[in-house]
From Swiss-Prot:
The keyword Zinc does not apply. Substrate binds at N123, T173, K177, R295, H327, S379. The modification N6,N6,N6-trimethyllysine is found at K14. This is Ribulose bisphosphate carboxylase large chain. Binds 1 Mg(2+) ion per subunit. SUPFAM superfamilies: RuBisCo, C-terminal domain, RuBisCO, large subunit, small (N-terminal) domain. It is found in: Plastid, Chloroplast. HAMAP family: RuBisCO_L_type1 (MF_01338). Its main location: plastid. One of its GO terms (molecular function) is magnesium ion binding. Its EC number is 4.1.1.39. The modification N-acetylproline is found at P3.
Length: 475
C-alpha cells in the first residue's frame, strides 16, 4: 500500500458495528425509473424497530456488512447501496411491515436471473434481526427487462406454430406418473391425443429412471404424436421433460427432441435452476422448440404467508429466464389458489403492462416492454364440471390440464379426452354467444351431454367431487 493510500484510508475510517438506519434508511429518496424495487414483508424480532429492520434488509442485500470496513472508502457506497425508502404496517397483522427497497441497476448482471436472486434474496433471509421475511413483489425496470430474451416464443407464436386459435388449449399429465414402461407410456399418450387433447405431459419427476429411460420414452412418445396427428389432422405435442442431473445431459435430451421433430419440451425450473433454464430457453428459441415449465418445489418457497418468496415473484423470474408455459394455479381443483391472487399471477405472465393493484397482491406497476408472454397452465384436481369456471377465469390464452380428469374416465383415455374437448368447445361457444358461464355453466355442460355420451359419462363420474379447503395465501 502506498503512503498516500494508507493515510487516506486511516483518515476516513472508523471501526465499529454499523447502525444500518444511518446509511440505508432513506425515507426522502425518490426511486428512479431504472431502480429495481422490492416489497418485503418483515416480521422483526421483539425490540427491533421496523426502520432498523428495513435498513438491515437493504444493507445485507446490497453493499452492507455487519461492521465498518476500510475498503468502503475505495468506492461510492452512495451510488451502489440499496435504500429502504418506505415502511408501512400490514393491516390486521401484529408486528408485520412492508419495507420498500430500491436497488441501483448497476448492482446486477445483465440478463441473469441467477444474479438477481442471489443479490436480493441470497443471504438476507437468515438475518437474526428478523423473525420472518417474505419477498412480496419486484418491479423490474424496462432497462433491465431489455437485457433478457424472455420466453422462447410466446403465446402468439405458439398459436401460429400449432395453428390453433379461438379457444384454450387442452392437456393431460400421463398417470401413473411413475412405473409405466416406455411403450405403455407412449400408448397412453396416443390415446389421449387422438381423443382430442392438444398436449400430453410428462410428470415433473419423470426424468430417466430404471423403469423408463429417457431415450426410450422420447421415441415412443414421438411415434404416438405422429400417429395421432395423422389420424386427427391436428398438430399435437407432448411435454418431454428434459430436466436432468447435469446441464449437459439436459441439452442432450433437448437436442434429441429437436431431431425427432416434436414441437415442445419441458423443464422443472426451480429444481433445475435458473441458469440451466435460461440456457434451455435460448436453445429452444434457436431451434424452434416450445418450452413448458413446471414449478415443482414452488410451495416450499411461496406457501407461507410471512416467510419466503411469493409466486408472483417466481413467475416474473420465469418470464425473464424463459418459458412458454408455466403452471399458475387453478382457483378451482385440488391445488391452492385464491382467485384474485391467481389472476394477478396470470396477468403478470401474459400481459405487456400491469398496473399496481394491492387487492391482487401487485405492489408495483410492471412494464414488460413487449417481452413475449408466458401461457398460464391450470392443473390439479380439475374435471369437466370445472370447465365453465376455467374458461371464465382464464379466457382463451391458457392451457387447461386434466390428468385424472382425462385418464379417470370410465371408458378410457380417448373418451376422457373427447369429454374434455366437447366441454371446452361448448363453454367457449356459450361465452362467445354472451352467456354468463358463472351462472349458466352447469346448464351448458348438461346440454352438451345430450350429444356427447363421453361427456355424459364423465359428468356422472365426477358430479360429487369437490376440494373444499380454505386457501392459505389470502389477502
Amino acid at each position: 500500500m502506498s503512503p498516500q493510500t494508507e493515510t487516506k484510508a486511516r483518515v476516513g475510517f472508523k471501526a465499529g458495528v454499523k447502525d444500518y438506519r444511518l446509511t440505508y434508511y432513506t425515507p426522502d429518496y425518490q426511486p428512479k425509473d431504472t431502480d429495481i424495487l422490492a416489497a418485503f414483508r418483515m416480521t422483526p424480532q421483539p425490540g427491533v424497530p421496523p426502520e432498523e429492520a428495513g435498513a438491515a434488509v437493504a444493507a445485507e442485500s446490497s453493499t452492507g456488512t455487519w461492521t465498518t470496513v476500510w475498503t468502503d472508502g475505495l468506492t461510492s457506497l452512495d451510488r451502489y447501496k440499496g435504500r429502504c425508502y418506505d415502511i408501512e404496517p400490514v393491516p390486521g397483522e401484529e408486528n408485520q411491515y412492508i419495507a420498500y427497497i430500491a436497488y441501483p441497476l448497476d448492482l446486477f448482471e445483465e440478463g441473469s436471473v441467477t444474479n438477481l436472486f442471489t443479490s436480493i434474496v441470497g443471504n438476507v433471509f437468515g438475518f437474526k434481526a428478523l423473525r420472518a421475511l417474505r419477498l412480496e413483489d419486484l418491479r423490474i425496470p424496462p432497462a433491465y427487462v431489455k437485457t433478457f430474451q424472455g420466453p422462447p416464443h410466446g403465446i402468439q407464436v405458439e398459436r401460429d406454430k400449432l395453428n390453433k386459435y379461438g379457444r384454450g388449449l387442452l392437456g393431460c399429465t400421463i398417470k401413473p406418473k411413475l412405473g409405466l414402461s416406455a411403450k405403455n407410456y407412449g400408448r397412453a399418450v396416443y390415446e389421449c391425443l387422438r381423443g382430442g387433447l392438444d398436449f400430453t405431459k410428462d410428470d415433473e419427476n419423470v426424468n430417466s429412471q430404471p423403469f423408463m429411460r429417457w431415450r426410450d420414452r422420447f421415441l415412443f412418445v414421438a411415434e404416438a404424436i405422429y400417429k395421432s396427428q395423422a389420424e386427427t389432422g391436428e398438430i399435437k405435442g407432448h411435454y418431454l421433460n428434459a430436466t436432468a442431473a447435469t446441464a449437459e445431459a439436459m441439452m442432450q435430451r433437448a437436442e434429441c427432441a429437436k431431431d425427432l421433430g416434436v414441437p415442445i419440451i419441458m423443464h422443472d425450473y426451480l429444481t433445475g435452476g435458473f441458469t440451466a433454464n435460461t440456457s434451455l430457453s435460448h436453445y429452444c428459441r434457436d431451434n424452434g422448440l416450445l418450452l413448458h415449465i413446471h414449478r415443482a418445489m414452488h410451495a416450499v418457497i411461496d406457501r407461507q404467508r410471512n416467510h419466503g418468496i411469493t409466486f408472483r415473484v417466481l413467475a416474473k423470474a420465469l418470464r425473464l429466464s424463459g418459458g412458454d408455459h408455466l403452471h399458475s394455479g387453478t382457483v378451482v381443483g385440488k391445488l391452492e389458489g385464491e382467485r384474485e391472487v391467481t389472476l394477478g399471477f396470470v396477468d403478470l405472465m401474459r400481459d405487456d403492462y400491469i398496473e399496481k393493484d394491492r387487492s391482487r397482491g401487485i405492489y408495483f406497476t410492471q412494464d414488460w416492454v413487449s417481452l413475449p408472454g408466458t401461457m398460464p397452465v391450470a392443473s390439479g384436481g380439475i374435471h369437466v364440471w370445472h370447465m365453465p369456471a376455467l374458461v371464465e377465469i382464464f379466457g382463451d390464452d391458457a392451457c387447461l390440464q386434466f390428468g385424472g380428469g382425462t385418464l379417470g374416465h370410465p371408458w378410457g383415455n380417448a373418451p376422457g379426452a373427447a369429454a374434455n374437448r366437447v366441454a371446452l368447445e361448448a363453454c367457449t361457444q356459450a361465452r362467445n354467444e354472451g352467456r354468463d358461464l358463472a351462472r349458466e355453466g352447469g346448464d351448458v355442460i348438461r346440454a352438451a351431454c345430450k350429444w356427447s355420451p363421453e361427456l355424459a359419462a364423465a359428468c356422472e363420474v365426477w358430479k360429487e367431487i369437490k376440494f373444499e379447503f380454505e386457501t392459505i395465501d389470502t389477502l
